[in-house]
Design a protein with these regions (language model features):
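ABC ATP-binding cassette signature C-motif
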Residues: 1-194
């Protein structure tokens, strides 16, 4: 449970959300996304904010469709452009023509991350985006986020990932939320004291 939380996130910020298991990180992400309503108080987002949320599971992917079909359905692209995007997210030519049902958890996460990049969202909220990803896939995600000019909010236990993508850390702990400037390493130094 989160109590008396006040948090402002500005356009273009890169925010990492950290804290112990069960502290409410996913709840905070869902509140920020508008996927969950607060029981008290309010969530306010500017009228031009368009949010997309990457959950810890990729259940929203149609299992019978192939990655190439899903990408081309998300945005009308020539097949060669869709293939190039999929390759950028480390899919090989065989994988892009197999149904999602045959894909691993990491492959589904990569596909969902790619789809986020194709949305009209100007705020991406990622809940444990590096789960199930190997190092090359995490690096591909980092590169895609570097090229994204909107706001990124990422719940993660991956210290290296947060150091690479976050310019502010929000610590969720004991029902409270505290913001720290800098990436994960700066947050860790600040918590441990001088």
């Amino acid at each position: 449970m989160l109590i008396d939380v006040e948090l402002t996130i500005m356009r273009g910020e890169r925010v990492g959300i950290v804290g112990p298991n069960g502290a409410g990180k996913t709840v905070l992400a869902r509140l920020l996304a508008g996927d969950l309503a607060p029981t008290e108080g309010e969530r306010w987002a500017g009228p031009s904010i368009r949010v997309d949320l990457l959950t810890q599971t990729a259940e929203e992917l149609p299992l019978e469709r192939t990655p190439i079909e899903i990408v081309r359905n998300a945005r009308p692209l020539p097949e060669s452009a869709a293939v190039a995007l999929l390759v950028r997210f480390l899919f090989d030519v065989e994988q892009i023509r197999r149904p999602v049902a045959t894909m691993s958890g990491g492959e589904r996460t990569r596909l969902r991350c790619l789809l986020l990049m194709l949305t009209e969202a100007n705020c991406l909220i990622l809940d444990e985006p590096t789960n199930h990803l190997d190092i090359p896939a995490v690096e591909a995600l980092e590169a895609a986020l570097e090229g994204y000019d909107g706001t990124v909010i990422a719940v993660s236990h991956d210290r290296y990932f947060l150091d690479r993508i976050a310019d502010r850390i929000v610590d969720v702990r004991d029902g409270d939320v505290t913001a720290y400037e800098g990436g994960f390493s700066a947050w860790e130094r600040g918590r441990s004291g001088p």
